Amino acid sequence: MRVLSKSLAAMVAAATLVGGGAFAVAGTAYAADNDAITVTPNPWYANSFDGWGTSLAWFANATGSLGEESAITTNLGDDASKAKAVEYGKQLREQFYQSIFGDEGLDLNMARYNVGGGNASDVAYGYPFMRQGAAVPGTWKDDATGSGTYGNGVTTKQADKDKLAAAFDPTDDNQYDFSKSAAQDWWIERGATGDNPDITDVEAFANSAPWFLTNSGYATGGRNSGSNNLANPEKFAQYMAKNVEHLESLGANVDTVEPFNESETSYWGTPGDMASKYTDESDDNTKLINNYWDKYYSDKDRSVTPYSNALKKPQEGMHVSNAQQQQTITALAEALKDNDDTIIAATDATNSADFVKSYNQYPQAIKDLIGQYNVHAYSDSNQMQSRDIAQADGKKLSMSEVDGSWQSGSYNPYGFDNALGMMSKISSNVTRLQSKDFTFWQVVEDLYNMQMGSNVNPAGENTNWGTVLIDFDCTVAGMDGKLYSERRVNNNGGTTDGLEPCTVIANAKYNGVKAITHFIHAGDKVIANNDEDNNMTATSDDGKTQTVIHRNSGTSDQTFVIDLSKYGEIADNAYGELYLTTETSAEDKNAGVDSATPEVFAKTSNVKQAEGSVMIDKAAKTATVTVPARSIASIQLTGVTGYAKDAAVETGDTYQLVGKQSGKAVADTTSGDSALSLANVASDAENAKKQTWTFTQIEQPTDSERPDLKAYVITNAEGKVLVSKDGTNALSNETVGAAKSDPAAKWILNTSDGSTYQLLNAATKTNLDVDNSGTTVGTKVGLWQSPSGTSPSANQTWTLRNVTPTSQKTVNVQTAVNEKAVLPVEVTLYYTWGEGKATVANWDTSKVDVAKEGAYEATATATDVYGNEFNVTATVYVGALTVSDPVSATVLAGTSASEAKAALEAAPVYLHVKASPAFEGDAAKVTWNFDGLDTKLADAKAGDNIAVTGTYQLDDATTIALKGAIYVTAATPENVADTASNLTVTNQQTEYSKGDQWKKLTDGDTSAEAWVTWNSAGDYSASPTATIDFGSECELSSVTITYGDKAPASAKAEYTTDGETWMQFGSDVKPAAGQTVTFKADKGTVNATKMRIVNTVNNDYMNATEIQAFVTPVQGAAKNIAAASGTNFSVNFQEGASASKAIDGDTTSKGWSTWASTASTVDPVATFTFDEAQTITEVKTFFYYDGRASWPKSQTLEYQDEAGEWHGVGTKDGWKIQAGDAGSGSDGITAADTPTVDFVLGTPVKAKAIRLTNTLQDTKVYINVAEIQVFAQDSTVLTPQPASDATLGDLRLDGETVEGFDPSKTDYTVDLPVDAEANPVLQAFATDNAAAVKVTGDAVENGKLGGKAAITVTSADESETKTYTVTFNAFTLASLKVIGPTKTEYAIGDKLDTAGLKVTAVYQSGDKTKEVPVALDDPQLAIGSFDSTTAGKKAITVSYRGVTATFNVTVKANAVAPGPEEQKPGNTNKPGATGNGNKNTVANTGSSVAAIAGAVALLAAAAGALFMLRKRA
């Protein structure tokens, strides 16, 4: 194929620049990859991060003495093996340390030192009276004999509690014995001291005060666990201060001291039984006590030693009342007044709800003494309220403790669910709390306790807490010179035979944590993103490295896209590195649980992937990676820096606040007691003024605890400051400068997605809030606290719309030659949030020449509703329209010809001036030829399309041909799943009032738990099933189910037509937690009367949040609307709240009952009213048998018409009723006699309401109704499904259809003209306007010559894809052939004579060569100059389109004159004269003139290239 005319692509490109870029064309958009997961970080919204920590309780106390001879309690070998065991312990301890704080381990950098309380000297304080390792010693000095430490013979025994409490002087060094804490101290000395310590932050905390400073006399809590157990806050505070002093004497700096631990709870109780109770030698508890007593506690008193027979033994802890908390904080501040480096932290509540409760009871003076807020995360609720408090007070918030197991079942260190769950817990909690850190409860757990079950004594918990694991009793030296667990040796008959020595073990959480801690470090900033549950995003301290940690918890690989649009710069050489953390290999798992060491986990931890695994697209502003199923990807980007302007809320900029829930703007219009209310988003200047707010940032000091806080003063258009006042919003006349130090005028921005915000008032710690979640204009905008859930409230969430325009929408205007161009008076401006209208008063068209075809620019100034003036341009195309795009419409099967015609006539017609942008045509000029359409439609079935031709009347003499298509499809499927009428489930949890929770499965909320199959007995069905009964046969197209955080092992969908034979629907799946699974027929739809989703679980429960079933609707089909939205159901009498059960979809269980202790004589009436009148076709009542004939004698149906009048439909009776009185029984009536009363209306009625009056039997027996169904004709307007056509309707080059184009032909080759400089403009249009067209390939790059283009067409329903290719064969200029001019010899001073010069361009394409003469006046031809001032051979260069060649001429020297001659007047300037009158002796070729002429010619050509504008489909 040949292009008949030379390509003018260069001029097309020039015209494109004039027009402002690419132009949208109908049918050229393409769908995004539905399988891609996208995260959008916002680097502007960043919070400083101090690092990763762990409490040292209890593992440090249990392991710090490893490697010391004194720690060995049993030696099974000799002295030599014992010495080896001591050395083994040292190595084990160091390996253990490195696994936690080493840079190849978890790389933690923070430690919480547990200041012990301890119990009395005669109380057995250790295992099994405490949890293993939990007996953290108090540092007060033991004096069991009363030797004088505390004076007056006071001992440290239980009986002297009160005396000791009185005698104890917490400031006296002599009353302390810090050797007792040596085991835990080892960890501090090893990690937190020296010049470059691993542990950079140390916090001292206590679980309990010393036993004698408690009310109960025990460090394990009160006898009443909910009562205050702190007896002396002042001495306890001083005790804490002294321990801080001790820690700092070791060389550590204690940053914070926290005197409480979950002290608000009632967790901490001392057992009521004493060890002396257990005397039965056959009792396992007695055996356990005796195993340890003689060896360790022979000097203790069983009668004062509490013992618990529970699996979990006691630990230190105390409930502290709020009043005692305040006294402790006050006393601690006094005790620390000389320590400038240590601040008080509080309250270490178990969750944010408890923290907020305690905080709200503190007076301001107490709050001022607290330097840091600490909170645990054992619940995610109320975390945003904790965050708000810390932000408003300008203090750091520490997430100071959490752990858990995300692995179901018993001990399984390899279970990767634990890694995935831990990653999500970290990312979501750090982001939501904006905490300075993430600190584990204890990142280590006692291996024995995690691993062992109930079949041994002592039993273990057999679960999966902790991250690193080690036995907490490695005190037995084996004959092999290794250490062993004392419990394991005891269980093994006192030998080590067959036992594994003490080893550092890990579980899968170890890798899940490392996937984050090895990439996000102290000093980095955690940044917001749109999916905090699955992504943690951060930027390095220097801003040069961007980190994204992403988990794929699904069962298939993900295409993971990082949206970089909110970053400021993407360097040309930007690159990314990908590290993957995956499940341990089957081979390593098969080695057994004792082989689950950190070294084994390292094999699949942070494995660096090949270069190029992260694909950065600078133009698209994306980074893309493939993340395998069930893995964690750690991605680091280099060369991506800063933040984009639209990612930030810039100081001095003006914004609209548009509500997420309401879609309306905040206006400074009073409503109630607030100065603010909702208003429709302004479309005029007057209203816009009331909705614009200027944000002025309050800069935070560099030494601030919250340097990254996004705090602002907000002013309205009049300059008034938005403030909180009396619990609501007001406008103040204070200055912005004054407002910056006014908490009431300080607004703090929070975001959960990096794009929408909540506005927190610092004074009230409440958010800008739409009253009662209203959405109507005038609704008050007040203040309210953040919600207790994990997501911000929609009525507190705002889009901040910067009202400064950024660019304009392209304006293209077409006019015929010599006709005045009509330019718009309104244009569209783009903003960071979207688009808005602006008015134009006058266009400058001085550069538009309507007398000549071409593309011209017009300019104007546009003014938007916010008062901004913005310079805009329009491109005016002068010339006639030449070609049209395909036109299509899609209609339902069965549509009449008139309706089909109307659909096509309503479709827009787009036309072009050759390759110009598209212009919508005038519908009045369109004529379609519908001959034979009636017949074609009658024969058409769903999936067919009908071709139609037409014309566009350009003028009286000219028409443009139109090609149209009418697609015939079935109706778009609708979701019919409804728990009120057709959906039922099995195995729903009934405990904790969750029996009806499954009914939320069709409420549209995919986030809230609905169907859950848990039960306390752990008796789980293998196949929890959800079934939908459609009531009649229908066309089923798809079914979806969204799972919660517990997905089944597998799931399948089935359907039936007869209720007995079930057939597979789609494929079996193995869903992941949180996944939405869609089941589809292999092709099209299936006929079904019922469908079901069958889930298989492996001895575990599952949960789901939403189910949908899509069927092809039938116009006017009857549908049960009894429980539908818009239907209101009421009864005149009911037992309790039973009426609602009459419309719950259950026709077999008891529902509405009118039983009463005193029989009612009122006839029961059920009424249904409808928000909109309904066409009723049937009303059906299912009565219920409860052992007697509890139903009416008759039932009457009435309806209310649209005018409000009631009409009777009929009365039904004739079923069996009682013969005697109401209490006489059923008179032989059985359940089989239960009536179902069915009113089928032969002629449907239009009703605003219906009512059923039940006439009581003569016995006045109550009635029981199982279900009432009300059927109405479905008023849903059916819409056709998208078509499945993926063919091209037209393929054009430079505005002309490609020669030989046929929709069925997919490959085209174009031989370009020899002298083409660029490819012609390629445009592709689908036959179906709703299909997506995407053009790719090097051939469509601007200025490209040759190459290949691929055109991918995706059908509107995305079921079909078709690819076309266009290959451009191009000749390239290889060389020039030059034949020199006729004149080859010149005298000095002569000019070049080009007569006879011939230049030939030599083009090549493969093995083909073509020669084309070049005219000497070609503006691209340049002929060089030569120096004619000296004699000799001269080379002259000829260049053409970047290729050069030379030819030679000779300059001869002037002949020597024989002697002086008389000079004749007037000849001094002739050539060859020796006089200096010839000032220009260098030959000029005119090349500079040619260059100027060439530039002028190009500009002129560009101006005339209206038909060559490049537009890519």
From Swiss-Prot:
Enzyme Commission designation: 3.2.1.213
UniProt domain Ricin B-type lectin: residue ranges: 666-801
Q: What is the topology of this protein in the membrane according to its UniProt annotation?
A: Single-pass membrane protein
According to UniProt, the reaction catalysed is:
Hydrolysis of (1->6)-beta-D-galactosidic linkages in arabinogalactan proteins and (1->3):(1->6)-beta-galactans to yield (1->6)-beta-galactobiose as the final product
Supply the alphabetized keyword list: Carbohydrate metabolism, Cell membrane, Glycosidase, Hydrolase, Membrane, Repeat, Signal, Transmembrane, Transmembrane helix
- Region Disordered: start-end pairs: 1456-1480
Q: Transmembrane: present as a keyword of the record?
A: yes
Span-the-membrane segments of this chain are 1489-1509
Signal peptide per UniProt? 1-31
Start and end of every F5/8 type C domain? 965-1112, 1116-1273
- Entry similarity comment: Belongs to the glycosyl hydrolase 30 family.
Q: What's the protein here called? A: Exo-beta-1,6-galactobiohydrolase
Q: Which organism is it from?
A: Bifidobacterium longum subsp. longum (strain ATCC 15707 / DSM 20219 / JCM 1217 / NCTC 11818 / E194b)
